[in-house]
Amino acid sequence: MSQIIVINFGSQIAHLINRRIRELGVYSELVMYNISAEKIKKLNPAGIILSGGPTSVYDKNSPQIDKKILKLNIPILGICYGLQLIGKHYGKVLPGKLKEYGKKQISIKKNGILLQNLKEQEQVWMSHGDLVKSLPKDFEILAKTDTCPIAAMENRNKKLYGLQFHPEVIHTPKGMQILKNFVFDICKAKKDWNIGNLPNKLIQEIKDTVGDKAVIMGASGGVDSTVAATLIHKAIGRKLHCVFIDHGMIRKSEAKSVMNRFKKLNFKNLYFVDASKIFLKRLENVSDPEKKRKIIGHTFIEVFEKKEKQLEKKFPNIKFLGQGTIYPDRIESAQPSKQASKIKSHHNVTLPQKMKLKVLEPLKELYKDEVRELGEKLKLPKQIVYRHPFPGPGLAIRILGKVTNERLEILKEADAIFMEELKKADYYDKVWQALAALFPIKTVGVKGDARTYEYIISLRAVTSKDAMTADWSRLPDWLLEKISSRILNEVKGVNRVVYDISQKPPATIEYE
């Protein structure tokens, strides 16, 4: 089977490159920057991609590449930092006068194979500080911008190619075409990878790993945890124990809905824990989003461990902790690389650190759309497979600032109206994720000829393939008007509704 190796130099979106290659039907594997040329040779890839990274190639502790890799006679594409590594090795890289972030127009000087099927002017996404100032010997410039003299370059004889921009993000419209050119026309890779028999493979791996032991798992009801739980359940049956912890920040009627869902899927060992009071008590007067995440994460561990110890007395063979962790969770927690900048903590990634159980993460190498495809193959109901993502900390990170009972009740009602109207209008399945958030400020309004001073609700709906990048959804005006009208009339404490039109990046999908 053909494969492309993506070498990660600490980029938050290195996995996005990996995902894009898989989308092309070619298997790709992500490895760390300190991999040796010998190991690369053994993997025998059709091509190599060098990712971007948050540091300068000249920083003292910046990640470097085994220079022998550049001489393996395997096609290599350097993206951003990856281009600069090639440029540093063969030419000269200088710090840019200004860091360049956002959309830019490139002028293509020579299409070559890498940029074939592109127009003379194309929009791309830049995110860099350094730039290759002088063209390395025997390289050719393929494209430039008004501020970047070498936006793309190649050395066909050495099979080295470089892009200063990011083809993997949606903000580079022809990015997939460029990757396709590299993978199929330069690397000559074969389109021979798909989910295929992955469910059976994962189920067998779980059987082999767990053996005669049992697994305990937090069941949130989301697509990730439900697909992971279903795989584990099919592998070990009644040896799986699922615990649903209500931390008080879940959506309206969520607890009842989740428990009923798992019962319909014939899960036998289900346990409900109402821990809302302890969570809300510990969140009193806490405004910092990272502190909120950590408090929720630590309290979740404490509550979960307490339940696990109770169950362990009855079921002493519980030795594994099942989790629905997927790639984006790990990326945003900067787990794959010491060089990566942390965006925010994910409590399901840090959970095992304080527990003595072995971790079982059947979905850790998959992306959300692949998880959904798995869910379909496992014949899970559509409303589970295409359920919108919901963060572990729940509404606590959709309430900006302090979490109070009043704010929670307001947000639960507003969120319920938003979801209900999206479903009624047949838009729920057309967006990747939709959410309501409460801003911790009040604005002046008028209701019934009286002055009001109440909260703002922000509505957000995005389209995406894998949550690594996202665009705001163009919901129709009439639908937004209806949702806004209902919230303003039915939810006490709100006098203003706004719609968020931010992309990711630079914004994240969630607010905190």
Residue ranges of predicted features:
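RNA-binding accessory domains that recognize and position tRNA/RNA substrates
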Residues: 1-50, 54-72, 84, 88-319, ...
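Conserved helicase ATPase motor motifs in RecA-like P-loop NTPase domains
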Residues: 76-82
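Extended catalytic-interface subdomain
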Residues: 323-324
